């Protein structure tokens, strides 16, 4: 089949020759498009495999934690190293003692600063893209250069994780959020387990 697609058919006069040349050209174009799509699927599969390996590593790391502060620190470290996140922000509704990092905040669920996140927290679905400016100070303070695109992961009744990037195209509306949801669920389960 590849040989047939690379053949050059001499042009002849007449309707039959013109039609066969036209059909051959259409088949070549379709073949190019299918090869392009196959290559794209292969790249997506490789990216997904890499993400699954990192989520597996995060799962194992969280299983090894014993205290709430270990859970929070482990999550942030894995997001920064394994997932190559430029900026991570973890907000919990209940205090986690022992975490004295600028990327961590304890903000009670009824605090007015969380009002801009009401819809996100209620839906419990990750959001990707650019955020409205009123949400940025709570998440990133003065470090807004990391807020060109953001993945926002609500954690049920536990809190909120924000991952920021300088790249305006890293997180975008419509991108898949399954892996982000898994990260949130792992964090929530590990934090609950460590508090028992």
Report the location of each language-model feature.
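Regulatory loop-to-helix N-cap segments in sensory/regulatory domains
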Residues: 165-181, 191-195
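A structured, mid-to-C-terminal "fold-capping" secondary-structure block
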Residues: 156, 160-167
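A short, aliphatic-rich beta-strand micro-motif
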Residues: 147-155
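Short, positively charged
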Residues: 1-11
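Helix-loop-beta substructure at the N-terminus of cytosolic sensory domains
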Residues: 65-103
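Regulatory sensory and allosteric helical modules in signal-transduction proteins
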Residues: 104-143, 148, 162
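Signal-transmission linkers at sensory-effector interfaces
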Residues: 15-61
């Amino acid at each position: 089949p590849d040989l047939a697609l690379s053949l050059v058919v001499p042009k002849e006069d007449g309707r039959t020759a013109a039609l066969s040349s036209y059909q051959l050209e259409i088949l070549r174009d379709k073949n190019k498009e299918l090869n392009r799509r196959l290559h794209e699927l292969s790249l997506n599969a490789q990216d997904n495999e890499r993400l699954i390996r990192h989520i597996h590593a995060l799962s194992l790391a969280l299983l090894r934690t014993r205290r709430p502060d270990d859970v929070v620190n482990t999550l942030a470290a894995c997001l920064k190293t394994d997932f190559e996140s430029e900026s991570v922000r973890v907000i919990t509704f209940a205090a986690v003692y022992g975490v004295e990092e600028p990327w961590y905040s304890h903000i009670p669920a009824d605090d007015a600063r969380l009002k801009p996140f009401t819809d996100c927290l209620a839906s419990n679905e990750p959001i990707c893209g650019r955020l409205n400016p009123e949400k940025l100070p709570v998440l990133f303070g003065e470090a807004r250069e990391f807020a060109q695109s953001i993945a926002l992961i609500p954690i049920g009744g536990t809190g909120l994780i924000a991952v920021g990037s300088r790249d305006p195209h890293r997180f975008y509306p419509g991108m898949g959020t399954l892996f982000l949801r898994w990260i949130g669920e792992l964090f929530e389960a590990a934090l609950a387990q460590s508090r028992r």
